[in-house]
Every structure is written in C-alpha cells, then in structure tokens.
Design a protein with these regions (language model features):
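Short beta-strand->alpha-helix linker/helix-N-cap micro-motif
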Residues: 22-31, 43-73
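Second-shell loop/turn segments in exported
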Residues: 27-33, 67-71, 140-144, 240-245
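Short, solvent-exposed, polar/charged sequence segments at loop or secondary-structure edges
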Residues: 55-104, 110-111
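Scaffold/interface architecture of coatomer-like assemblies
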Residues: 104-105, 126, 269
Length: 289
C-alpha cells in the first residue's frame, strides 16, 4: 500500500513538473514600441503562471534576427522548425500588434487595437493555435487599454495549448506503430520529369477553390497555404497535411476543400499508383461589392 501511494505521488509530481522543463520564446510583435510592449507583457504573464521557462527577450530578438526572421506569419514547416531551433525553446509565439484609425458607416472615426498571436511548436514546426483579439473605442488609448486587459486570458489559453501539445508530442514519440506505414511515392517536381520517369501525375476531376473565411477577412489576411495530399490508386484523397501554414482559418478551409476533391490517379507505366502531391492555394481578400 505504501509503495502504491509512493508511486501515485511520484506520478503526480512528474505530471506537475513536465511542463516546467519546457520553454517558450515570445518574438517581438513587430518593430513598433506597441508591439514590443505587448510581447513583453505576454512574457510577464507566462512567467507569473510559472508553467514554462520563458526565454530572455534580448536573446530571442538576437536569435530571430540571426536567422533572418522578418516578421512573417506565413511559414513552411521547415522554416518554422529552423526558427524554433535558433530560438532554442520548445514553443514560440509570433504576432503583430497595432492601434489603427478606422472608419465605417456606423462610426465615422474610431480606433481598433488588435493583437495577432501564433503559437508554434519548435519540434514539429506546426502552427498549434492562433488568436486575434480586437477592441474598438473612440479613443486610441482606451482601445489599447482594453487589449492589454485581455492579455491574461490570452496567455492562459496559450498555456493550455502548450500543455496539450507537450503531452501530444510526448505520446507521438513513444507510440510504436503496429505495422509499417505504406510507401507512397512523392510526385516529381513537374510533368516533364514525371513523363521521363514513365509517370502521369494525379489530376483533379474538378478544381475547387477554398472559401475565404470571415476570420481572414477581419484581419485582411493574404497568404499562401501549401498542403501535402496523399492521392490513392483509386483517385480518392487520403491524408492531408499542412506544410505551409497561414492561420486566420485559411489552413482549415484549405484542408476541408482538398478532402472534397476527387482525382484521376497517378499512373506509372500505365498502372494506377498512390502518390503524394503538393497543392498550393494563394489567398487574397475578395474585392468589396
């Protein structure tokens, strides 16, 4: 009985401290003082919570500059992993913060204070979650103040996401597959190379375009989303993975669209074969009617 209680205590201790060994970097939210201030306040919120080690702001800034990071929120998995390796933390936060003068039919003049936040896993390069809290007020200072008041809730949601990702990635590393993954050939770079190898690339029956979601419209987001899609020998879409993320709901819109598509399968020497293809979608805000 004593051993059982001791084992439970050790398990609880390890669970409580597994996050403390993980770290997070917060990259400045743009070059403005507003962006730097919000990033620093977010670091302070993380430190107060105590769940994760928080990287030094100056070291984070130097590491990001050292690999040429210039503020993009539209990265490939490789680019995201490279940035994470330079920052030397388990997770990192990217973003953008501004206070903008706006106008509308209802309000001739008002101010919007917003903060775009992307949480990224350094190990996988995946975009774990994104958020864009926004507050309007007739005075810029009050709009900004409302945004700052929201940072406690924002940091709490990010901490929950990091806890979940820590556990998920730990399980990914420990799970042993019961059978080897099927070998799926990657598509050659272009049709000429494919033809020289006796192959024909998959072709969609009908090209579908993802809808531009309202969440992207609110942010005036323009970005490129790349997905790697496995097309079976029957022409049906299997696994779809984001390899260049953009946030703002664009990734989800892309995956949902690709999964609705049907293809003429790839051929090799006249025989249908499964193939992994890269599909790219460029998003631009539609013009106003």
């Amino acid at each position: 009985m004593i051993r059982f209680i001791h084992a439970i205590f050790v398990l609880a201790f390890l669970t409580a401290n597994c996050y403390a060994n993980s770290s997070v970097s917060v990259v400045d939210f743009g070059a403005s003082e507003t962006g730097k201030s919000v990033a620093e306040k977010l670091r302070a919120q993380f430190r107060t919570a105590g769940d994760f080690l928080v990287a030094d702001a100056d070291l984070t800034r130097s590491a990001a500059m050292g690999v040429g990071y210039a503020g993009s929120l539209n990265l490939t998995l490789d680019e995201a992993r490279d940035l994470g390796a330079a920052l030397a933390s388990d997770f990192y936060v990217l973003g953008d913060t501004r206070v903008l003068r706006r106008s509308s039919f209802e309000k001739p003049v008002y101010f919007e204070a917003y903060c775009t936040v992307f949480l990224v896993s350094s190990r996988t390069g995946r975009l774990l979650t994104w958020s864009r809290p926004s507050f309007n007020n007739a005075e810029p200072g009050k709009a900004y103040g409302l945004l700052l008041q929201n940072l406690a809730d924002l940091s709490h949601s990010l901490i929950i996401a990091m806890r979940r990702a820590t556990e998920d990635e730990r399980l990914e590393r420990t799970v042993i597959p019961t059978s080897p993954a099927p070998l799926i050939e990657a598509a050659p770079d272009d049709e000429k190379v494919a033809a020289a190898q006796g192959m024909r690339l998959p072709r969609p029956f009908k090209r579908l375009r993802p809808e531009y979601p309202d969440s992207a419209a609110l942010a005036d987001a323009e970005a490129t989303v790349d997905v790697a899609a496995e097309i079976g020998a029957d022409g049906e879409v299997g696994d779809v993975q984001i390899v260049r993320w953009a946030g703002f709901g664009l990734d989800q819109a892309t995956v949902a669209t690709v999964k609705q598509m049907h293809f003429f399968p790839a051929l090799k020497n006249g025989t249908a074969i499964p193939m992994r293809v890269l599909l790219r979608y460029n998003f631009r805000k539609p013009p106003k009617d």
